[in-house]
Amino acid sequence: MIVEVFFRNFYRNYAKFDIDAVEKREFAFQYFEGGIVRHRAFKTLEELKKFVIEKTPRHIYHSSAYYERPGEEDMERKGWLGADLIFDIDGDHLDTEACRESKLVSIACLNDAKEEANKLIDVLTGELGLKPRRVVFSGNRGFHIHVSEEEVLTLGAKERRELVNYLKAVGFDPSRFVVKKGRKKVVLYEEEVGGNLFRIRQGVEDPRALKIEIDEVVTQDIHRLIRVPGSINGKTGLLALPLSQQDLEKDVEQIVERAIVFKKGNLKLRFNKTFEGAVLFEKINAREGDVKVLPAYLAIYLELQEIGKIYD
């Protein structure tokens, strides 16, 4: 498979995985031919890289959890030591026009996801006093935020669920802050613990502004597998790109440009279905059976999405 060769060459020459405490993580791999392998453990990043070059998986994941025995298949015997707090913001969960109209990677939808990621980081730092350890462009339609501070590592699923409810404003009632005074409505604000007055004000004016659209299943799962930062997303061919918080203030086009790893050359793609739409930086208009010469990164993306097939 041509795409697999591209992946292998990238991992051999450029791979740089960004993982803390690799020796305490469980790893999982999904291959191009199908199937997933879990419960793999590595002592060093170099050992992991050697394995990846040899096997060339389509997807690479590591556990949010730290284990005494990460390679143990029995979850009860792994020896759970704690887990990072992981937040997944994905275009699939955003009810915006840009994200609804297409399930492919679009700049407009990523802008919406970036705005949501910035909102989350503001709440984590401003209201909860938590500093993200890592911010990652997922390589697809969103962002992953990792928090690794000691006080969150041993939170159980119940506590993480309560945090999810707080971030998603479950049970928030705007009417609590509005009273009638004659014919007028007066909005009352009360400074609450955590300093979230500004978010309350926004929520009273527009309840949707209070809610942060995170994937709740990801955050509350203390054994969650998350895509390895620095690996290629096997759905798109884009890099799961580690970012600084300052990067989230930049145009999303700059983030996507840095995540494109197959920048050189062109490839022929035969479309297996009629397709019209925007993909990454390009507009595509093709009928089933059409053959087009495309930039390598775009042809790889479309094959991974099963829209076409690369051929020599």
Curated annotation (Swiss-Prot):
Keyword flag Magnesium: yes
GO biological process: DNA replication, synthesis of primer
A single MF term (Gene Ontology): metal ion binding
Cited InterPro entries: DNA_primase_S (IPR002755), DNA_primase_ssu_euk/arc (IPR014052), DNA_primase_ssu_PriS (IPR023639)
Protein name: DNA primase small subunit PriS
Cofactor: Mg(2+); Mn(2+)
Function: Catalytic subunit of DNA primase, an RNA polymerase that catalyzes the synthesis of short RNA molecules used as primers for DNA polymerase during DNA replication. The small subunit contains the primase catalytic core and has DNA synthesis activity on its own. Binding to the large subunit stabilizes and modulates the activity, increasing the rate of DNA synthesis while decreasing the length of the DNA fragments, and conferring RNA synthesis capability. The DNA polymerase activity may enable DNA primase to also catalyze primer extension after primer synthesis. May also play a role in DNA repair.
Provenance organism: Pyrobaculum islandicum (strain DSM 4184 / JCM 9189 / GEO3)
Keywords: DNA replication, DNA-directed RNA polymerase, Magnesium, Manganese, Metal-binding, Nucleotidyltransferase, Primosome, Transcription, Transferase
Assembly description: Heterodimer of a small subunit (PriS) and a large subunit (PriL).
Source species, domain of life: Archaea
Record-listed E.C. numbers: 2.7.7.-
GO cellular component, one term: DNA-directed RNA polymerase complex
Family: Belongs to the eukaryotic-type primase small subunit family.
Active site annotation, chain numbering: 88, 90, 215
HAMAP family xrefs: DNA_primase_sml_arc
